Amino acid sequence: MKMESSKMLVVFTLMVLIAVSSDLVSGNFASGEASSQLCFNPCTPQLGNNECNTICMNKKYKEGSCVGFGIPPTSKYCCCKT
């Protein structure tokens, strides 16, 4: 009985993690353009617009740039346009 309840708890926990992570994995952070761009790595002094664009072009996207998020924009992420 104890083994069955432990298995059920593990399965339930994994199902919750999968459901939550599937929403996060999509990578779309911009609500207005969620279907037209994919955002991932935070932009830094080393990862700027040029580097972001290069990464996106290498992944066969049309273009890429650092996009600010928040009001006011407090963080920037590298976003590839589809």
Curated annotation (Swiss-Prot):
**Entry keyword Membrane:** no
Q: Where does it mainly reside?
A: secreted
Q: Answer whether the UniProt record assigns the keyword Disulfide bond to this protein.
A: yes
Any one of the GO BP annotations = killing of cells of another organism
Q: Which UniProt keywords apply?
A: Antimicrobial, Disulfide bond, Fungicide, Plant defense, Secreted, Signal
Assigned GO CC terms? extracellular region
Q: Which Pfam families match?
A: Defensin (PF24552)
Q: Which superkingdom does the taxonomy of this entry point to?
A: Eukaryota
Q: Where in the cell is it found?
A: Secreted
Q: Name the InterPro entries on file.
A: Defensin-like_dom
Renumbered to this chain, the signal peptide range is 1-27
| Disulphide bond pairs | C39-C80, C43-C66, C52-C78, C56-C79
What protein family does this chain belong to? Belongs to the DEFL family.
Q: What is this protein called?
A: Putative defensin-like protein 70
